[in-house]
Amino acid sequence: MRIIVPATSANIGPGFDSIGVALSKYLSIEVLEESTEWLVEHNLVNIPKDHTNLLIQTALHVKSDLAPHRLKMFSDIPLARGLGSSSSVIVAGIELANQLGNLALSQKEKLEIATRLEGHPDNVAPAIFGDLVISSIVKNDIKSLEVMFPDSSFIAFIPNYELKTSDSRNVLPQKLSYEDAVASSSVANVMVASLLKGDLVTAGWAIERDLFHERYRQPLVKEFGVIKQISTQNGAYATYLSGAGPTVMVLCSKEKEQPIVTELSKLCLDGQIQVLNIERKGVRVEKR
């Protein structure tokens, strides 16, 4: 049995802690034979291989008496880069418990568990459902809406340095002014409506007018300014910080994809430039 979970890009503009999209990088968990103790085989750096691995901790949180197994973990989702690496593991852990424990969890139940563990639904929701998911959590009441993201390209600049979510959150203010809150709310409304209509020009306008988080976090990602400038000059819809950063995401049409990649490559920035596609499916299980 193999469990596959996509990467995600969240905090899309003013969709702070609320809106995320599934993208074409993946965590894969191969479930092998039962064992006397949990073993997670992988080649990742500084990640436990025993029961303390987040994958196993999550699975045991869902069902504490699961029989230990030998597992193989593969992932091309970079760690601490704002592409949902921890969320993918949490979602995989929930699915691992669901499969080994024969729990028959609904998608809604998976989302509730994942949100409780992660603290917010913006990454875990698209990892579960796929595509674009708009979510809200108010006093533990979770609502989510799955919609189709308009056809487009996501060009990711993935820096060679990490930016921990905790560090990125520490630069955020404790409060927003009433004026900024109203402005951000209205911009978020326009962004959602334009995405639903397939109007990426207006959506891009709204994405770049977030007041919730990006203006505080941009100084932590020195490459952001020049990437936005070059991408805008070459016809991108929007440039935004993916998740808590440091990945910088450029949203553009398929036609503009290669010209933008070519121009960004000329900058010789300290990181990788990768074109990602929208993943329409969330977590899935392949039986052998």
From Swiss-Prot:
Coiled coil start-end: none
Matching PANTHER family: HOMOSERINE KINASE, HOMOSERINE/4-DIPHOSPHOCYTIDYL-2-C-METHYL-D-ERYTHRITOL KINASE
Short name of any one Pfam family annotated for the protein: GHMP_kinases_C
Name of the featured protein: Homoserine kinase
Biological-process GO terms, alphabetical: threonine biosynthetic process
Origin species: Streptococcus agalactiae serotype Ia (strain ATCC 27591 / A909 / CDC SS700)
Reaction catalysis annotation: L-homoserine + ATP = O-phospho-L-homoserine + ADP + H(+)
GO molecular function: ATP binding; homoserine kinase activity
Homology family: Belongs to the GHMP kinase family. Homoserine kinase subfamily.
Top EC class of this enzyme: transferase
Transmembrane found in the keyword field: no
Positions that bind ATP: 78-88
Main location: cytoplasm
Gene Ontology cellular-component annotations: cytoplasm
InterPro entries in the record: GHMP_kinase_C_dom (IPR013750), GHMP_kinase_C_sf (IPR036554), GHMP_kinase_N_dom (IPR006204), GHMP_knse_ATP-bd_CS (IPR006203), Homoserine_kinase (IPR000870), Ribosomal_Su5_D2-typ_SF (IPR020568), Ribsml_uS5_D2-typ_fold_subgr (IPR014721)
Function: Catalyzes the ATP-dependent phosphorylation of L-homoserine to L-homoserine phosphate.
Cell location: Cytoplasm
Top-level taxon: Bacteria
EC numbers for this chain: 2.7.1.39
Pathway entry: Amino-acid biosynthesis; L-threonine biosynthesis; L-threonine from L-aspartate: step 4/5
Alphabetized UniProt keyword annotations: Amino-acid biosynthesis, ATP-binding, Cytoplasm, Kinase, Nucleotide-binding, Threonine biosynthesis, Transferase
